[in-house]
């Protein structure tokens, strides 16, 4: 047993405490991090990391990862590698980093799978979900892996994340409706660990328990709704999650909707005229009426980009209000500073000639902004624009770039369009398209960890 490093670290801490010297101290680094003093934390972690202390290397790498800066992300990968031999946790975090990386190579994907597998074998149970997602999204990289067989083995061994992975597989394979009983059983068991199970349970009850939707005192709903609201009051569940559950309950496409229960939930988290109410009435008119929503929009507190976006959608789609593309454009322009989807709608207005003529450059600019903000539908629209050439010169290489990006983001109807573009793409244009795709991915994913991915990595 090697006691040298712990003894040295203890000695350094003692010297710091007694002599008030500015020597590296892991305890001080953690305290500084807790109070938001990242410079002090980074200085202590870095000095200790350079001396070979594994925990300090992990602390430094976590800080580099959380920064979101492209250069710091590259350094985080290097720092995690410093700790690989001594720490299964380092393998887990580097594996997740590589697995979540949008521009990862085939070699990096295989390395991620190996690291996550090694970490799991060493007792890091939190890697199962990212490992399953890696296999699910990259079947061509892992042709010999039977994900369902792996999940069956993990579930038989009692690993909680395997249950959640199973639900994702059901959704991805289009077999969700065939496994409602299994999903209900999983989520009843995993509510405390995975709050997203509240949404799944609401979906299951609407689809499989039609009699429940009109029985307010039904035991099945009490098992889901009341713990959800209690968890929200205790700070364990976000208002966003409650809103999502309310949206499920209000959706008639999932079953016999229950708008009254949805209203009761929303009244607790966001009394009218909160923005969640405006959106809910727009998407599911059963929770209100046009006059009620417009009244909410007229409130002084509604003078915000989200309200402008919703008004733009009302005039754009002609839903609840007469269609008026000019008014839609006006409201989308007001909203676009902070509402990314406003750029998408503007791009569609300009692309489709809703204002009386096509504005191709405005369409490209708006759609590209939306696409780079994470809107897969904008990538698909750009692929259509460049492949069809309405008001713009046909450019199949550009069309290939955006069709590929739409496919990578999981837009289901983009695959047929991509295949059609490929069939008409000359070899030289294919090469140019690949080069432009790489450049666009670098521009888009220079900071390639989204806030959601970063949070997922840190929570898992």
UniProtKB/Swiss-Prot annotation:
Location relative to the cell: Cell outer membrane
One biological process term in Gene Ontology: alginic acid biosynthetic process
Knockout or disruption consequences: Cells do not encyst.
Zinc among keywords: no
Signal peptide start-end: 1-17
Pathways per UniProt: Glycan biosynthesis; alginate biosynthesis
InterPro entries assigned to the protein according to its UniProt record, in alphabetical order: Sel1-like, Sel1_AlgK, TPR-like_helical_dom_sf
Sites of N-palmitoyl cysteine lipidation: 18
Keyword annotations from UniProtKB, A to Z: Alginate biosynthesis, Cell outer membrane, Lipoprotein, Membrane, Palmitate, Signal
GO CC, alphabetical: cell outer membrane
Residues where lipid is bound covalently (S-diacylglycerol cysteine): 18
Membrane topology per record: Lipid-anchor
Role description: May be involved in the polymerization of mannuronate to alginate.
Family: Belongs to the AlgK family.
Protein name per Swiss-Prot or TrEMBL: Alginate biosynthesis protein AlgK
Organism for this UniProt entry: Azotobacter vinelandii
Organism lineage: Bacteria, Pseudomonadati, Pseudomonadota, Gammaproteobacteria, Pseudomonadales
